[in-house]
Design a protein with these regions (language model features):
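Short alpha-helical interface patches
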Residues: 18-23, 158
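Conserved N-terminal alpha-helix of the aminotransferase class I/II PLP-enzyme fold
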Residues: 22-69, 91, 95
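A generic structural signal for short, non-catalytic loop/turn and secondary-structure boundary residues
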Residues: 1-2, 51
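N-terminal/domain-start segments enriched in small and hydrophobic, helix-friendly residues
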Residues: 7-9, 20, 30
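Conserved PLP-enzyme active-site core in the AAT-like
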Residues: 2-5, 9-15, 41, 58, ...
Length: 180
């Protein structure tokens, strides 16, 4: 891999030769016990990464597809407050607009989120909060623990985009009160 470009982006990522070779093997039966054992092991490992004992669902799709699935299944028809301080928060807001009454709580891109504005939105009846933990487009890490605590205090659901933080930073979904 020394002569290959080093991609310093969220994805795609360079793959070592051993990974590429493993991917070139014959496919296994996705309904068989071998696959079931592999899947169960993956879920157990992912639960540690996510900091959760709750159910996990592996989706075949992009991060945007996963965020749309979260909003479509948990926020449809609800009053949604979307915290935005970068491209992916904006994308999550645009998704939320299609599924509920979405309110954008925007900060300047790369600036800290306004938790007082979130508190006011929750007091006004917001039922769901969306946020991006690590806003890749601006390089800012948002205070997921504090945001989830505010949502929980007001009985609102917290949907967190952890696409670039899980596996690279501490994520404790259960302890913080992140729902999805």
């Amino acid at each position: 891999m020394e002569n290959e470009p080093l991609l310093m982006i969220p994805g795609p990522v360079p793959m070592p030769e051993r990974v590429r070779l493993a991917m070139s093997r014959q496919a296994i039966n996705h309904r068989g016990t071998e696959f079931g054992d592999i899947y169960a092991g993956c879920i157990a490992t992912l639960k540690k990464c996510f900091g959760t004992e709750n159910d996990l669902f592996v989706l075949s799709g992009s991060g945007t597809a996963a965020m749309e699935a979260a909003v479509a299944n948990f926020a449809t028809g609800r009053k949604i407050s979307c915290l935005v301080n970068g491209k992916f928060g904006d994308r999550l807001f645009r998704i939320a607009q299609r599924y509920g009454t979405a309110q954008e709580l925007a900060s300047e891109w790369g600036a800290p989120l306004d938790l007082e504005a979130l508190s006011s939105a929750l007091e006004a009846g917001a039922e769901v909060v969306t946020m991006v933990h690590n806003e890749t487009s601006t390089g800012i890490k948002n205070p997921a623990k504090e945001i989830a605590a505010l949502a929980r205090k007001h009985g609102a659901l917290c949907i967190m985009d952890g696409i670039t933080s899980i596996g690279g930073d501490e994520v404790r979904a259960d302890a913080w009160g992140v729902d999805v």
